[in-house]
Amino acid sequence: MLGLHGRKPAQVIVEPVAKLMIKLKVTPNQLTLVSAGLTVGVALLLIPTGHLIWAAVLTGLFAAFDMIDGTVARMQGGGTKFGATLDATCDRITDGALFGAITWWLVYSYDAPQALVAASLVCLVASQVISYVKARGEASGFTMDGGLVERPERLIVSLVGLGLTGMGVPYAIDVALWALAAGSIYTVVQRLVMAGKSPLAKEFTKAPAGAKADYSNTK
C-alpha cells in the first residue's frame, strides 16, 4: 500500500543520497548487498539480546537503503534484471531475519505466550508468501499492484512495535504482531483473488520440459 503512494515524498530525501552514491561510484548492487548485510546483522545481534530501541532505529535506517539502490539504478538509466533479482532475494532474506530474530526474542527473553509466538511465525511465513504470490502472478502476466500489507508496512509496524516495547510501552509488540499477522493473511488472500480475477487467469500453462503435454488420446 505504501509502496504505491509513499515513494514520491520519500524521494525528497532519497534522491540527494542517491546522487552522492553515484559520485562515489557506488553501484546499485553494492548498495543492495550492504543494506541487506547490515540489516540482517543488526536484527540478529540486537533483537535477541533485547536492545530493541537501537534495533528498531538501525534496522529502519539500513532498510531504507533499499530505496536508494533503485533510485541510483534509475538515475543511471535503469536497473538490470540481475539487479532486480538480487534486490528481491535480499528483501526476502532481511524479512526472514527480522521476524526470525523477533520470534527468538519472544521465546527466550519476552516470555511470550505461545499464541504470540505463533503470530510472529505467521508474519515470517506470510512475508515470504505475499511476495511470492506477486512474483508468480506477474510471471504469469497478471497485474499484481498493491496489497494491504506490503514490505514497507511490515517494516514500519514491526519496528515501531519493537521500539515502543523497548521504551516500556506495554503490549506494543503484541499489538504490532497480531495486526501484521491478520493483515498479512488478508493480503495473501487479496492477491490470490486479484490473480483469479485477471483476464489471463484461465489460460492454460505449458507442460514442464519432458512432461507429456497431450493426454487426449489416452485410454
UniProtKB/Swiss-Prot annotation:
Keyword Ribonucleoprotein among UniProt keywords: no
UniProt xrefs under InterPro entries: CDP-OH_P_trans, CDP-OH_PTrfase_TM_dom, CDP_ALCOHOL_P_TRANSF_CS, PIP_synthase_PgsA1
- Print the keywords alphabetically: Cell membrane, Lipid biosynthesis, Lipid metabolism, Magnesium, Membrane, Metal-binding, Phospholipid biosynthesis, Phospholipid metabolism, Transferase, Transmembrane, Transmembrane helix
User: For binding a CDP-1,2-diacyl-sn-glycerol, which residues are annotated in this chain's numbering?
Assistant: 29-32, 70, 74, 80
Kinase is among the record's keywords: no
**A cellular component annotation (GO) from this entry:** plasma membrane
Q: What class of enzyme is it?
A: transferase
Q: Which transformation does this protein catalyse, written as a reaction?
A: a CDP-1,2-diacyl-sn-glycerol + 1D-myo-inositol 3-phosphate = a 1,2-diacyl-sn-glycero-3-phospho-(1D-myo-inositol-3-phosphate) + CMP + H(+); 1,2-di-(9Z-octadecenoyl)-sn-glycero-3-cytidine-5'-diphosphate + 1D-myo-inositol 3-phosphate = 1,2-di-(9Z-octadecenoyl)-sn-glycero-3-phospho-(1D-myo-inositol-3-phosphate) + CMP + H(+)
- Topological type in the membrane: Multi-pass membrane protein
* Localization per Swiss-Prot or TrEMBL: Cell membrane
What GO terms in the biological process aspect are recorded for it? phospholipid biosynthetic process
What is the required cofactor set for this protein? Mg(2+)
Pathways per UniProt: Phospholipid metabolism; phosphatidylinositol phosphate biosynthesis
Primary role: Catalyzes the conjugation of the 1'-hydroxyl group of D-myo-inositol-3-phosphate (also named L-myo-inositol-1-phosphate) with a lipid tail of cytidine diphosphate diacylglycerol (CDP-DAG), forming phosphatidylinositol phosphate (PIP) and CMP. PIP is a precursor of phosphatidylinositol (PI) which is an essential lipid required for cell wall formation.
Fill in the subunit field for this protein. Homodimer.
Q: What is this protein called?
A: Phosphatidylinositol phosphate synthase
What taxonomic classification does the UniProt entry list for its organism? Bacteria, Bacillati, Actinomycetota, Actinomycetes, Mycobacteriales
